């Protein structure tokens, strides 16, 4: 795991910032979000990274991130919505950052595009709970999560999403350990989704209607 981290930092250099998702979904499960002790659901590498010296974690009790690098403070701002103003996705897009996936098909960056576009098949749901910060201080926190409407078929259409974003200009794909590493320019990723949503607001969900 350390070898992988060393490779990342070698590539991004002193001016780069490494960000990894450390999602816990704590408030969705009525659990306390402890920034130091709440384990991530995102795999061994992400859990290993968040425990490294100098790594900081965001305050989001649902979709947190572990961050280290030259511009880390830009990504550590508090936010009232998981995919809203000042969230990691917004800063990554504005900073023209890169978005990389190791295998898997789900892309949470898509939800940022959906919230900013205000898609009809999601709505803001408020979650509240206890957050314990890095100084072991507890306080109440409330955050909005732009969740799916369950009365319609709003499951993500992964085939459509992947086909769309894999057509961005700077998309790169490499085989690795029996799966794929995909790299996107975050701004291009968001803009192509907005372009498609302008044409058809159902294009990113299973309830896909070609004549919507």
Annotate the PLM regions:
Residues 1-212:
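N-terminal and secondary-structure boundary signal
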């Amino acid at each position: 795991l350390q070898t992988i981290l060393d490779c990342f930092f070698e590539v991004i250099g002193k001016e780069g910032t490494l960000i990894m998702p450390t999602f816990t979904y704590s408030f969705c499960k009525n659990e306390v979000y402890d920034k130091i002790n709440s384990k991530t659901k995102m795999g061994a590498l992400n859990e290993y990274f968040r425990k490294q010296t100098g790594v900081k974690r965001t305050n989001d009790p649902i979709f947190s991130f572990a961050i280290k690098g030259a511009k880390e403070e830009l990504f550590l701002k508090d936010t009232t919505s998981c995919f809203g103003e000042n969230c990691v996705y917004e800063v990554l897009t504005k900073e023209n950052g890169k978005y990389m996936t190791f295998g898997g098909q789900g892309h949470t960056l898509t939800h940022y595009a959906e919230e900013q576009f205000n898609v009809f098949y999601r709505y803001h749901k408020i979650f509240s709970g206890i957050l314990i910060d890095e100084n072991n201080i507890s306080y109440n926190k409330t955050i909005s999560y732009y969740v799916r409407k369950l009365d319609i078929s709003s499951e993500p259409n992964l085939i459509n999403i992947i086909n769309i974003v894999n057509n961005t200009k700077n998309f790169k794909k490499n085989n690795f350990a029996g799966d794929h590493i995909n790299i996107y320019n975050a701004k291009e990723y968001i803009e192509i989704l907005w372009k498609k949503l302008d044409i058809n607001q159902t294009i990113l969900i299973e309830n896909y209607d070609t004549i919507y």
